[in-house]
C-alpha cells in the first residue's frame, strides 16, 4: 500500500536483502518514485600487523557484539593472520567473551534478541555453519530462564569447502585465518554484500591500499565497524543497497536539479 500510494514520492528502506528485493520489485512499476535501500551486510574486520592485542580485542568485541550483534554494520567475519600473534588475539577474544555476565543486571553488556523467531534463526544459522564444516570455538546457546538471551558464538570458518554468505543478525563472529595480507583482503571481499568493513593495524600504510581494494561503503581504520556519521555518506554496494547512500548524500537524490537557460530579449 505504501509503495503504491499516489501521494508517496519515494521510499527509503532499512532492512534485509530479502525485504529490499521484494520492495524493489513492487517499485519497478513506479519509476517516477525514489527508492533508497539500506540493506544487510556480511561485514569483515581484518586485524593485521598489530602488537596492541588488548586494544584490538576491545575493538573486535565492540564491533561484533554491541546491541547483541543487532546492528547492520556489526562485524560478522574476523580475519586474522595465521601466526602466533593471530592465535593470541583469538585466545584473548575468547577470554573476553567468556567473562560476560548474564545474571547481574547492573553488569549486563547486551540484552536479548528481538524475538523468538530471531533467536531460532540465529541458532539455526550456527547449526548450518557447523554442518558445512565450521569448527566451534564458543557455541551459542540460550541462557536459562531468560527471554531470547543467547550467549555469543565464535566459530572458525577457515578451510570450509563451501562458504555460507548470508547476513546473520545476532552475536556471532566467524573467524578466518589468512596466510598473507592479500589473502585477507581477498577473503574480506568474498561476499555478495558490501556495507561495512574495518582494518585494525599498527601500520597506517596498510589502510591506504585496504580502503581502495575493499568493496564496501563504510570502511574504518582502528575503529569499530559500527562507527558512522550522518555528515558522511552511509550505505553499501552489492546486496547491501541500491547505490543510494544515506546521510549527507541523501539530500541529493531526495531532490531534483532544475536547469534554466536565461537570456535577455
Predicted regions and their residues:
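Short amphipathic alpha-helical segments
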Residues: 3, 22-26, 90-92, 211-212, ...
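ALDH superfamily catalytic-core signature
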Residues: 10, 18-159, 221, 264
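Phosphate-coordinating loops and pocket residues in cytosolic domains that bind phosphorylated ligands
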Residues: 4, 58, 115, 186, ...
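Solvent-exposed alpha-helices and their adjacent loops that cap or buttress functional pockets
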Residues: 3-5, 27-29, 36-39, 70-72, ...
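A structured beta-alpha segment of the ubiquitous adenosine-cofactor-binding alpha/beta core
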Residues: 1-12
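Conserved C-terminal structural/oligomerization subdomain of aldehyde/semialdehyde dehydrogenase
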Residues: 7-8, 46, 142, 149-265
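Well-formed, non-transmembrane alpha-helical positions, independent of function
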Residues: 1-2, 59, 128, 253
